[in-house]
């Protein structure tokens, strides 16, 4: 087997000296199309030879391998250039070397056409145009009036026109024009810079891996937490004082004296207590406010009676123009007299007192309690206080001391009954002493 490793250079007339088309980049060349294996296979078919066989070897370390390929055609081996980094490029280089050597070995009078004269030139030129995103090459053939070669063809690619040699047929003229364009493109400046090599497929320079530049991550500013809106709910607070449990419910109604609702009267809060010693029940009403109290037995019941009717209790009515005056040092209310005296009758047993507030007194936040007493005195000559005197006791119903005040009044009346005269009215205070109005 004959082996050729050092091919002879081409004649000077076949050197690549034509400039590359305008717009062609150095990174994309004709050899990137990899058509030399196809050319070699087409040549073998036309010559009646066997299909070319490629043998590729791998050398060097695993991270930087080096490939070298050998092609066998017509019992002749052709080796590729050394230093390729991939198998495909090494095989293309071996096919190119084989084609170059076959062209030189073919006699001039042979019937087999040269590889450059086949239709692969047009295919190669079209594939190159697609790689470069150019338009499809256009061929314009003209027929001169005189001459042995009647057809001349011009091909345009990348904005540059290339004129081929004259040919007897239109097809041959297009092939020659494509061949002229390929030779011009292959003679670009990059091929000249690599030592003006006659081969197209040459090993490229290895490009080191660029260090990955990670973008500097800027920390995102923390978002301020939004303040949560607290919902106001109606809460029940249980307060214990002196053994009394009071259930207070928050009222979201409009408050009296508000800037927008100045005409709205304040509705007093309903205070409900269990019936026990000294417990006071207060309930508001539009026409009259009724206060019910169920004290122990030692407290007398007083009910209002305008017509002086006989009953178990006496009627207590506050004055229309009464004013509430509360003493700062005590929870005791100041009693104001009424213009008209209300008669009271003696009753043998009085257990509790029923008190009624007045509307005008409610506006000020206090309740006027008028206490008319039916007292059984024995002996009557002991009393030195003038009879028929009205007694009024003003007590703040919102004060926790109101039940205690009534309890004290009842104890005072029960313990000092000898000082009271029948049908007499007196001013009552929490102090055990009694004062005349």
From Swiss-Prot:
A GO biological-process term: regulation of gene expression
Tagged with keyword NADP: no
Gene3D superfamilies: 3.30.160.20
Domain DRBM: 35-104, 120-187
SUPFAM superfamilies membership: dsRNA-binding domain-like (SSF54768)
Keywords: Repeat, RNA-binding
Residue ranges, compositional bias (Basic and acidic residues): 288-310, 320-330
Coiled-coil annotated residue ranges, if any: none
Residue ranges of the region described as Disordered: 1-22, 288-331
Superkingdom to which the source organism belongs: Eukaryota
An example Gene Ontology molecular-function term: ribonuclease III activity
A GO CC term attached to the entry: nucleus
Keyword field contains RNA-binding: yes
Protein task: Binds double-stranded RNA.
Protein name per its UniProtKB record: Double-stranded RNA-binding protein 3
């Amino acid at each position: 087997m004959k082996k050729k490793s050092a091919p002879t250079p081409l004649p000077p007339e076949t050197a690549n000296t034509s400039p590359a088309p305008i717009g062609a980049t150095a990174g994309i060349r004709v050899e990137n199309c990899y058509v030399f294996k196809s050319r070699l296979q087409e040549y073998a078919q036309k010559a009646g030879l066997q299909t070319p066989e490629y043998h590729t070897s791998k050398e060097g370390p695993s991270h930087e391998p080096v490939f070298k390929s050998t092609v066998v055609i017509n019992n002749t081996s052709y080796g590729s250039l050394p230093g390729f980094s991939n198998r495909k490029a090494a095989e293309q280089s071996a096919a190119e070397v084989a084609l170059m050597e076959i062209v030189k070995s073919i006699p001039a009078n042979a019937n087999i056409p040269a590889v450059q004269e086949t239709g692969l030139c047009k295919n190669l030129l079209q594939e190159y145009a697609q790689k470069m995103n150019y338009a499809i090459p256009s061929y314009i053939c003209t027929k001169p009036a005189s001459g042995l070669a009647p057809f001349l063809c011009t091909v345009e690619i990348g904005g540059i026109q290339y004129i081929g040699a004259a040919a007897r047929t239109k097809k041959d003229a297009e092939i020659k024009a494509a061949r002229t364009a390929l030779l011009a493109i292959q003679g670009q400046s990059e091929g000249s810079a690599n030592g003006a090599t006659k081969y197209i497929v040459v090993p490229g320079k290895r490009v080191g891996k660029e260090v990955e530049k990670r973008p500097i991550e800027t920390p995102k500013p923390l978002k301020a937490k939004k303040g949560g809106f607290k919902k106001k709910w109606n809460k029940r607070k249980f307060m214990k004082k002196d053994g009394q449990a009071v259930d207070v419910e928050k009222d979201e109604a409009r408050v009296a004296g508000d800037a927008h609702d100045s005409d709205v009267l304040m509705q007093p809060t309903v205070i409900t207590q269990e019936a026990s010693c000294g417990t006071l029940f207060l309930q508001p009403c539009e026409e009259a406010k009724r206060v019910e109290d169920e004290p122990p037995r030692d407290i007398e019941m007083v009910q209002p009676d305008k017509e002086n009717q006989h009953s178990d209790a006496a009627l207590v009515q506050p004055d229309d123009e009464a004013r509430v005056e509360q003493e700062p040092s005590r929870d005791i209310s100041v009693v104001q007299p009424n213009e008209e005296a209300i008669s009271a009758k003696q009753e043998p047993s009085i257990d509790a007192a029923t008190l009624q507030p007045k509307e005008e007194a409610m506006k000020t936040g206090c309740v006027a309690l008028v206490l008319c007493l039916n007292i059984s005195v024995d002996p009557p000559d002991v009393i030195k206080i003038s009879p028929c005197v009205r007694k009024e006791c003003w007590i703040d119903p919102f004060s926790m001391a109101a039940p205690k005040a009534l309890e004290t009044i009842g104890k005072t009346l029960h313990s000092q009954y000898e000082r009271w005269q029948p049908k007499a009215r007196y001013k009552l205070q929490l102090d055990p002493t009694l004062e005349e109005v």
